[in-house]
Amino acid sequence: MRADIVTIFPAYLEPLRLSLVGRAQEHGTLQIHTHDLRMWTTDVHRTVDDAPYGGGPGMVMRPEPWDAALSQITARVADSRPRVVVPTPAGTPFTQRHAEELAREPWLVFCCGRYEGIDARVIETWADDEISIGDYVLAGGEAATLVILEAVTRLLPGVLGNSASVADDSFSDGLLEGPVYTRPPVWRGTEVPPVLRSGDHEAIARWRRSQALRRTLLRRPDLLEHREFAEADRVVLAAAAAEAAGRMLPAPTEGTGLIHHRDVEGPGEG
């Protein structure tokens, strides 16, 4: 995969040399090219922004540098057009499914906006995707590009040493991943669930599925909407819902206090 990133702060993308994304580049799986948008300005001040039409605070990124940059970058590979991604809080929410879709592309171009954003005419002309990484506002698109590109890179063939890691990820099957444990078997008085040390792979798979369902119900119930579940899953969800409803019970002593029970996700389920 090739990824081109256009920004006015190229140094912001230095972390892409590290860890998994850096190794993907070393192994030739991923090629990243970072471009300074100011290289396509035409005035002595290398201006990339101007006041917004209609008034209002802040500045808007001018269309001319963006058009010149994207025209030149997209012409560098003959007979191929990249998928152009603009990170923006006004975009479509980024999900694991979106990462999987982008990972199938041979060439991505990321446009990192700043200030109040990029002139809408650039978006209409060039963008294939406007993507939001959450319901909050950042100073620019660079941090979002780091997030998106790492999520995509780990899905590329051969990047992860164990392909099962991808299959077990949160969201890989639409559920959050359950709790994970390693050595020692007992730490600060808390024992690793015995089922995980039993060697019974079917029981372990059932436990992990149960924990994923429970965690998703508690933390992201929206992910369970409009889905069909097997009978075994429905039993787990019903039990988890009942336990969650019982977390706050009237205190057995006089008064109106409540007993708060711990989260229904428990390490001891077998």
From Swiss-Prot:
Catalytic activity line of the entry: guanosine(37) in tRNA + S-adenosyl-L-methionine = N(1)-methylguanosine(37) in tRNA + S-adenosyl-L-homocysteine + H(+)
Residues bound to S-adenosyl-L-methionine: G113, I133, G134, D135, Y136, V137, L138
Protein's UniProt keywords contain Transferase: yes
GO annotation (BP), single: tRNA N1-guanine methylation
Xref: InterPro entries: Alpha/beta_knot_MTases, tRNA_m1G_MeTrfase_C_sf, tRNA_m1G_MeTrfase_TrmD, tRNA_m1G_MTases_N, tRNA_MeTrfase_TRMD/TRM10
Cellular compartments annotated: Cytoplasm
Claim: Ribonucleoprotein is one of the keywords in the record: no
Compositionally biased spans, kind Basic and acidic residues: 260-270
Cellular component per GO, a single term: cytosol
One function term, GO molecular function aspect: tRNA (guanine(37)-N1)-methyltransferase activity
Annotated Pfam families: tRNA_m1G_MT
First-level EC class: transferase
Region (Disordered): 251-270
Key words of the record: Cytoplasm, Methyltransferase, S-adenosyl-L-methionine, Transferase, tRNA processing
Subunit and interaction comment: Homodimer.
Protein function: Specifically methylates guanosine-37 in various tRNAs.
NCBIfam families per UniProt: PRK00026.1 (NF000648), trmD (TIGR00088)
Stored PANTHER family: TRNA (GUANINE-N(1)-)-METHYLTRANSFERASE
Family: Belongs to the RNA methyltransferase TrmD family.
Protein name as annotated: tRNA (guanine-N(1)-)-methyltransferase
Organism: Frankia casuarinae (strain DSM 45818 / CECT 9043 / HFP020203 / CcI3)
Gene this protein is translated from: trmD
